[in-house]
UniProtKB/Swiss-Prot annotation:
GO terms for biological process: pantothenate biosynthetic process. GO terms for molecular function: 3-methyl-2-oxobutanoate hydroxymethyltransferase activity; magnesium ion binding. Mg(2+) binds at residues 46, 85, 117. InterPro entries: Pantoate_hydroxy_MeTrfase, Pyrv/PenolPyrv_kinase-like_dom, Pyrv_kinase-like_dom_sf. It is an enzyme of class 2 (transferase). This is 3-methyl-2-oxobutanoate hydroxymethyltransferase. Pathway: Cofactor biosynthesis; (R)-pantothenate biosynthesis; (R)-pantoate from 3-methyl-2-oxobutanoate: step 1/2. It comes from Desulforapulum autotrophicum (strain ATCC 43914 / DSM 3382 / VKM B-1955 / HRM2). GO terms for cellular component: cytoplasm.
């Protein structure tokens, strides 16, 4: 069995120039596959609201819902670092609320770390959670929980603010930072300035690692994919074909056959 990926593992990978791989997962079967594939980080993202629950944004996801999914994922993983995504309004009201909710991911769901969105504005929260002994992954740029404030899912281009936010979340104690929806050149500048690893999603090839939503890259749905997504499989088409074959086999009497019964 390979050793578990830790924050130290990720720091070393950045120092050695080894690319970090990350994906989302939301349940035990898929987390088992992702972990077995050697993916370094599994994020149990609040994106589950959109890709699993069928909602329009990530905002309605609750702590209890994401803890339920995180626990399923951690039970499947032997190597990958499992990061729990702190949902909207689970850390914004007070620092005490944020620390308590972050702690629930480790105590109740056996996660290794938490992720939260925001730059300079959430640095006191990052600092408090990290001080409590909980590893924190930051997330700057396009932050889906602020979709209404941003006026939609828009690429973020303010280089000065983005670089400043990245440096500040690092100083606050984040062990890594997700860069989402940022021009490639700015993401590259940030990556070179930081000591902690950068994980890109729609931020170009210059980041220390990459993350995608599992359902997007495996082709598990038919919704519009962002420009930055590469589809590595078409499981929806394969699943539809299998379901249709099952339907036809039951209707024409070829399933179940004699070998599927007991004597």
């Amino acid at each position: 069995m390979q050793p578990r990926v830790t924050t130290t593992t990720l720091f070393k990978m950045k120092q050695e120039g080894k690319r970090i791989t990350a994906l989302t997962a939301y349940d035990h079967p898929f987390a088992t596959l992702v972990d077995a594939a050697g993916i370094d980080i599994i994020l149990v993202g609040d994106s589950l609201g959109m890709v699993v629950q069928g909602k329009q944004t990530t905002l309605p996801v609750t702590m209890d819902e994401i803890l339920y999914h995180t626990a399923m994922v951690t039970r499947a993983c032997n190597r990958a670092m499992v990061v729990g995504d702190m949902p909207f309004m689970s850390y914004q009201s007070s620092i005490n609320q944020a620390v308590d909710n972050a702690g629930r991911f480790l105590k109740e769901a056996d996660a290794s770390a938490v992720k939260l969105e925001g730059g300079a504005d959430v640095c006191p929260v990052i600092q408090a959670i990290a001080k409590a002994g909980i590893p924190v992954q930051a997330h700057i740029g396009l932050t889906p929980q602020s979709v209404h404030q941003m006026g939609g899912f828009r690429v973020q281009r303010d280089e000065e603010r983005l670089v400043s936010d990245a440096l500040k979340v690092q100083d606050a104690g984040a062990f890594s930072v997700v860069l989402e929806g940022i021009p490639s050149d700015i993401a590259g500048i940030i990556t070179k300035k930081l000591d902690i690893p950068t994980i890109g999603i729609g931020a170009g090839p210059g980041c220390d690692g990459q993350i995608l939503v599992l359902h997007d890259m495996l082709g598990l749905h038919d919704r519009h994919l962002p420009k930055f997504v590469r589809q590595f499989a078409d499981l929806r088409t394969q699943a539809a074909r299998g379901l249709e074959q099952y339907r036809d086999a039951v209707r024409n009497g070829s399933f179940p056959a004699e070998e599927h019964g007991y004597k």
